[in-house]
């Protein structure tokens, strides 16, 4: 099975976008009502690799994986051998033995591509100098919850050029 990354918004199509948003809204309702959430990620480990500080991204990812039954491992360059010159290739190969997915928050988009190149597990972009696709999804969800569909009456998205191809 081919791994599916979420490095750029272009990694998902309209159908996937709608499915992700629908699932996120459903999970939010369950969480808000205090209802149990199916543990669909039980026995899955998420490696969260941070090169830059984060509050919302870290909390969101860590709570999400835990609520879905998985585990989060938080790493940064100061607590791994990356600080001593270990290559991304070596780090990726070691981590993929233990983790099922990586979330990387980096200063250089090219590092996301390196993690993709050297690992067999999916890569999620937690923010790079080029894009922040998870934030775009969160913004779309927030907009729709507060103002309705992101499409105007003519069917054209009102969010911006990056979303145009999705609708």
PLM region descriptions:
Residues 1-22, 106-133:
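Helix-enriched interaction subdomains in cytosolic or periplasmic regions
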Residues 26, 101, 126-142:
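A glycine-rich, Thr/Ser-enriched phosphate-binding loop motif common to dinucleotide/cofactor-binding enzymes
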Residues 45-46, 50-98:
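Active-site cofactor/substrate anionic-group-binding motifs, chiefly glycine-
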Residues 50-64, 144-167:
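Glycine-rich phosphate/diphosphate-binding loop of Rossmann-like nucleotide-binding domains
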Residues 72-74, 102, 123:
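Hydrophobic beta-strand scaffold residues
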């Amino acid at each position: 099975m081919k791994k599916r990354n979420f490095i750029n918004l272009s990694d998902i199509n309209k159908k996937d976008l709608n499915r992700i948003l629908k699932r996120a809204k459903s999970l939010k309702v369950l969480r808000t009502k205090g209802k149990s959430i199916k543990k669909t990620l039980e026995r899955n480990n998420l490696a969260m690799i941070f090169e830059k500080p984060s509050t919302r991204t870290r909390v969101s990812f860590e709570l999400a994986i835990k609520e879905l039954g998985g585990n989060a491992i938080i790493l940064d360059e100061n607590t791994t051998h990356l600080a001593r010159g270990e290559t991304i290739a070596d780090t990726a190969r070691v981590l993929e033995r233990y983790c099922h997915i990586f979330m990387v928050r980096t200063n250089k988009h090219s590092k996301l591509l390196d993690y993709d190149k050297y690992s067999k597990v999916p890569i999620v972009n937690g923010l790079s100098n080029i894009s922040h696709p998870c934030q775009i999804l969160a913004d779309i969800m927030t907009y729709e919850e507060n103002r309705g569909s992101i499409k105007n009456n003519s069917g054209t998205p009102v969010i911006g050029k990056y979303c145009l191809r999705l609708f």
